[in-house]
Amino acid sequence: MGEPALAPSTEQRILRSTVAGYSIQLARLLVGFAAKVAIARLVLPEGHGLYELALRIVTVASAVRDLGLPYHLVRDTRRPYGTVLASTTFLGAAITLLLVVAAPVFGGLDPDLPFVLRVFAVWVVLDGLSVVPKAFFERELTIGRLVGPEVARGFVIAALSVGLAWLGWGVWSFVAADLAGALLYGVWAWSRAWGKVPLRLELPLLPDLVRKSAWLFWIWMVLQLVTYIDIFIIGIFEETDVVGFYARAWGIAFLVPTIVYPRALFPTLVEYLEDRDRFFEVFRLATVQLLGFQVLASYFLLFNAEKSVLILLGKDWAPAVPLLLVLSFIPFFDQFTILGGEMLKARHEDRAWLIIMVVNLICLVGFGVIFTSRWGAAGMAAANYCLLGNLLMAWRVWDIFRPRFRTLAADLALLYLLPLPFFALAAWAFPADSWTRFAASIVAAALALAVLALRYLKPFRAFFGRRA
C-alpha cells in the first residue's frame, strides 16, 4: 500500500485559496470592465452617472442588510450559518420594500433616479442570497468553489448589459444585467454549498451575533460611505454626466487593486493569530503583492492618462482625463489602509478600525464639499489625498509590529521609488499624449515588475513552500 497523502499545510491551503481568489477577481473584473468599455461607446455619460448613483444606494443598503454578520461568520466558532441566512433574507426583503417606497427622496440628485431605484432595489434581496455560501467557502479557505459561479455571473452581466445597451436600453441595460447576475450567482453558489453548510436555525443566537458583529457592521457602513460618497457630493454640485466621468475614471484607477487584492488575507490572518512571525509575514507579503502591482498601474496612468481614457472609454470621454490624473495614486494610499483594516479585524480591534474610517469619512466629506464647490469633480478627487485616518492606520501598524515595521517601511519605499526611474525615462524620451510614450511605459512597467519579482521571489517561495 502506498503512503497516505499528506494533508495540505495551512500555507498551501492559503496559496490555493489565494490563487482561486485571483482567478475569480481577474476573470470577473476583466470581463466586467470590458463590458463597461463597450458600453461607454453605447450609453451616454448621463446614463453611466444615473446608474452609478443608483448602484451606490443599493450597495450601501446591502451593508445595512448584512449587519456585519458575514464578516463575523469567518471568526465565529459556532458557525451559525442558518441564523445568518434567516437574518439576511428577512432584512433584504424589508430593505427592498423600503427603497421602493422611499425612492422619491433621492429625486434631488436626478429626476430619473427614483424610477430606476424602485427596480434596482430588488438587487438588495437577490445579492443577499449568496452571502452565506460565500462566507462559508471563504472561512474554509476553499474559495475555489466560487470560481464557476463568479465567472458565470461576470459573463452574464457583461453579455446582457452590452446586448441591451446595443438595443438602446440605456441605463436599464446595467440594471437588468446586475439583477440577472445576482440571481444566477446566488443559485449557483448554493448548488455548490448545499449539504455542506450547517443550516441549523438558532434565533436565540441572533442578538449575541448582532452584538459581536456591531463594530464590523459600522466599519462596513463607514467604509461603504468612504468609498462611494464622492459620487453623491459631485451629484450635488455637478450634472449627472460629470458623475459618469468621475465614476469611470475611478474605475480605471482602481482596476488593478480590485483584481490583485488578496481575498484570502482576512481568514489567513485569523489562522495565524497565535503565530506572530507568520502573522507579520503574511501581512507584509500581501502588502508587497498588492501595492507592488498598484504602484506600476499608478505611474502608468499618471504618464498616459489621455491614451488610457481614449482606449478604454473612447474620444467622447475626454473630460475624464484630468480626473484620472488626480486619482491615479489614490489606490496606493487607500489600499494600505484597507489591508491594515483586515489585520485589525483579525485581531478583533474593531473599534480602532472604526475610528480610523470615521476620521477618513469626516475628512472626505469636509474637504470634498469645500474642494468640489471650488474646483468641481477634480476637487473631489483631490480630497481623497487628505484622509487623516490613513496616518492613524500607519501609526497603528507601526505600534503592532514595532521593530519589524522598519522592514515593512523599507518595502513600501522600494515599491514606490524603484519604478520611478523607468517611467521617468519613458516620459523624458517621448512627448506627452503620444503612442511612443504609451509603448515605452509598457516596457517600463515590465522592467520594473521584473526587478520587483526578483527582489521578492525568495520570501514568497519560503512562505508558501512550507509543508505540513
Where are these regions (language model features)?
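Alpha-helical transmembrane segments of multi-pass membrane transport and lipid-handling proteins
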Residues: A86-V119, A159, G163, Y261, ...
